[in-house]
């Protein structure tokens, strides 16, 4: 269930993730990170991790590169089926896992295929307490924000992969690899918050339900998809070996009809026991409450639509030839055309008959108090408006609700285009019987075109920026020495220069002006990539 991979202990954005050697686009909105939990483990044959990058590898991986290799065509008929189950303590529901792999070779072993499918359904959840601590003027600590949360999540994964290859003769081969992954997360969250809790124990109580529409199980649906399709070939052209490939990849994230309903009761008083700092407890004083009732008022009712897509079109050519008996030269070029779009639409709704709406909402509540609450059973999450009620609301009925678009939520929308053109040369030579050297140079040119948004909280307006263009070039040398004085000892010494391109939110030419907070956030499309000099020494003794 780990989400992002880390190499060398660097942040995830400093490493790259690829499938069969091709970078995967990111379904995240503001960053380039790829969620590894999108791809089930049973779809992967091998995981390759490279820390010292060679010139024939993409240069944007300071920490290193993680390459997920899908299953290749087998040498003979293969059939494998997997089924599994489990039980989740929080959701009190069973989990299911199914997998099927089949492959064979035909036409005198010239044609091979391997097809795999995987399905996982995992109802899960979590119990959560969160506290924000502050100090008063006398240096005394107190809790400023106090939250009790319950999550119920059903994660469903579907994954399909296909590998084909056809060998014309010993010098010519063509292959295809494709993978499609779909992950649906249906999430409901029930949260009680003591907002702005003072050192004297006074706070506003907020009670919130996170839900969705009936067609999405009355839950917030997050649907992430990735797909990668690559056609390649291996050919012998005289003294040259030619490898080529052309591919298309796409990643997307959809969050349709994500709804929140939030109620508030102002200025309640609490006795806050912080003698146990890991499990502080706030108890309402007599006459005060943190349980949803008709004393509360509607704070907000919102709905959000989110659509994020990233697409890559890729071409690569590699040529290799021998330079004498103990050396070879490899060189090639690669082109990637990337487009990315982030679109969010956000509305606040106000019931025209707020008193009648409150009565109806309070008639559709559910008690989430749970003796199995893992942090401690002393925390009582309380009563919430049910997810079914939130999902059933016809928010577009103008006779029931008025609506207002929230411009601040649209400020992060953008459209981006990146074109990366790369060329490299790599020499591999054996200096002696015990020493091998690999080294070369990679050149990458990055051209950008971005359109963002400008938001001003004084006028409550959002407008598109003019397209901003920029480009930069990186020269990335690398070398690796390998010394093998005997069969049981190997010493490697490597150096390479690599980069990490800025996250999207940093280079989109947007502007977010918050005059009330005296803050302004500005994207800088002229930002260049972060560069790094990497040195590696590795010794192995068997």
Predicted regions and their residues:
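Extracytoplasmic beta-strand/coil segments of soluble accessory domains associated
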Residues: 1-23
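N-terminal periplasmic accessory domains that precede
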Residues: 3-6, 18, 32-37, 49, ...
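Short acidic/polar hinge/loop motifs at secondary-structure boundaries
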Residues: 23-51
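Transmembrane beta-strands of outer-membrane beta-barrel proteins
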Residues: 79-81, 111-115, 174-176, 231, ...
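Transmembrane beta-strands of outer-membrane beta-barrel pores
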Residues: 85-89, 119-123, 180-184, 237, ...
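Transmembrane beta-barrel wall of Gram-negative outer-membrane proteins
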Residues: 92-194, 224-231, 235-238, 477-479
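Outer-membrane beta-barrel signature, preferentially recognizing the C-terminal barrel domain
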Residues: 208-228, 408, 412-421, 470, ...
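Flexible glycine-rich, low-complexity coil/linker segments exposed to the extracellular/periplasmic environment
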Residues: 271-300, 354-412
